[in-house]
Amino acid sequence: CVFTNIQRGVIGEVKHPLVTEDDWSDADKVHIPEEYLSFDVDQVNRSCAQRADKFLIAGCCPRPFEQLQFIRGTVNLYMDLMDPPKGFWAFLEKMHDYYCRLLKKWAQTDVDALNMMDDWGSQNSLLINPKIWEKVFMPMYRDYIDIAHAHGKKMFMHSDGNTLSIIPR
């Protein structure tokens, strides 16, 4: 994907996404970075042991909403979320499976916490309807949190903007 940056020092926006077909039939263009699953757990644990007096957070960070924007472009993703094509669900499942495997591997290390992020809010409100967030994204976040807790880890979630409409969830 190609990012367009209109202001120096500020992250850009995808203007030429990888997935351009409305049915997501070209989603095979997207590379799921399986190689990130090959890190050395023992090496991470040795590093953690050297910093036993510190609170250590894993070196991975699932961000499904932002990743989908990078892959599809913001406007196209918003349309997909309103009327999701079958290919969208298939890709989302594949991406979520990858993130779960990555978190499980990090959960095997001696870090104190796992983390995830997605920037959900504008200055005034959530970027999508809270009901769509609850249906599509909340179950993934729940899985990520469950992985952390099942391994005795804390989970941190970063988000920017006004997210008050989903905080009670």
Please state what every model-predicted region is:
Residues 1-3, 56-57:
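Short low-polarity hydrophobic stretches
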